[in-house]
Amino acid sequence: QFASSAASDVYKRQVLTNDNLDELDRFDARCRLSPGIIPEAMALIVNKTSPSMLKKSNLSHYEMIRQFVETLKRWGKATYIGFNSIEFDEEFLRCTLFQTLEYPYITSTNGNTRGDILSLARAANLYYPNTLKNSVNEKGNDVYKLDQMAPLNGIEHGDAHSAIGDVIATIGIAKLISKKAPNVWKASMLTMDKNQSLELIKKELLFCTNEYFYGRSRPYVQTFICQHPQYQWPLCFDLRHDPSPYLKMPIKELTAAMKKQPKFIRTVRHNKHPVIMNPSYGNQFDEYKLIGTKKLEERAKMIKNNEAFAEKVSSVKRSEIDEKEQTKSQEDLYNEESIYAKFTSTEDNKIMPEFHSVDWNKKLQVISKFKDERLQYFGKKLLYMEKPEILTKSDFNIIHKDISKKLLSTNNENWNTIPRTYSEIDTLRAKFEKENQPEKLKILDDINAYVEDLEKYYSSA
């Protein structure tokens, strides 16, 4: 079964389907704005939602996430799909779960797998042109935006990005791919689990996959060399290149060659749902067709039979890692940014359910059991948002000042800040005045008033 999702700071939408993508159940909830959170102004406008509407919701963010997690547990094992979900929604969900004292990797462990319909749509159109209809931008490239693709492909989904429309549209695109490009759909089923994906890449003599950059999908017929020493991603040789000169190169020369364009070694991120096709698909493209299957196989065997080359490539990558470590910024990460800095321990993971099950007045005792300081911080931050009177004055002030520092920052941060939001409001106001859109201007005024109140409250911290 599949679960298709979309998420933000104030809503969570998920639809459960069977293997034929027919809906079985759904989760659709909207919550109050959490203290110190500024949603993107444009996201609120697209959703026709104002801060005053969100203030009226009875559900807090913490309660919404609790309901959501319980729903996923009830649904059981599933494949989680979305549109650009692996790069965006999944990362957003992981960080949200991490900060809500839930296990962050719920969608890719315990028999669950994940896939991305955006990368699938690009692969389908590359190998089976016109599987999906796209609008074209001024550079002549296909546009892969859900709100534009859905109507072009006859998908009825209500208003894209509103209510649950974007989730329904994603399922509609998935259905079209499964019908019109079934081989791409079948291939995608084999790489939704990262371990299965890695096994497939290592086992095949050669395979065809695609990458998307500068607005276009490009095919690559490749063979596995070795895994990246730090990230474990498969490093593969692009077989349009003759491997002979590279196999003999001393390490210094190979290091220099690996920095040049075009790249002869490519990274396949096996944990991000690559679409691995039969190498015969490469014959659709001149750069591989002209070389021919026989020669491509010979080149693949040369790589596979040369362990010394694999060791050299691995060594070059290890040197790159050391170099990066030395030049790495020494700036401290905020707790909220530290999800990948280190994994939470098994012991701490076992304490998380206890935090959720006890009454609010007992949660501080549970927080003190966490060994990981980040989890202690998140626990206290949840109390700050839900039951601030339980916190000591000192703990309240630490979190209050921390939120204030983040919100008032004038740096280019990974989160929304007050100065950035004012700037976005000014830009949007000029746009909507020009387009004569009073409804949108009204929401904008509401957002502006909300941000002014936030600024007053946190400026005194």
Segments predicted by a language model, with ranges:
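Metal-dependent phosphoesterase core characteristic of DEDDh/y 3'-5' exonuclease domains
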Residues: 9, 16-47, 72-182, 188, ...
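Substrate-recognition/cap regions that form aromatic- and gly/pro-loop-enriched pockets
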Residues: 312-418
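Generic detection of long, well-ordered alpha-helical segments
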Residues: 58, 62, 87, 164-167, ...
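Single conserved hydrophobic/aromatic residue that forms the stacking wall/gate
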Residues: 1-7, 11
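Short strand->helix junction
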Residues: 4-5, 54, 160
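Conserved DEDDh/DEDDy metal-dependent 3′-5′ exonuclease domain
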Residues: 44-129, 282-350
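Acidic two-metal-ion nuclease catalytic site recognized across multiple nuclease folds
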Residues: 176-307, 404-461
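Metal-dependent nucleotidyl/phosphoryl-transfer cores and adjacent nucleic-acid-binding surfaces
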Residues: 8-9, 15, 34-43, 57-64, ...
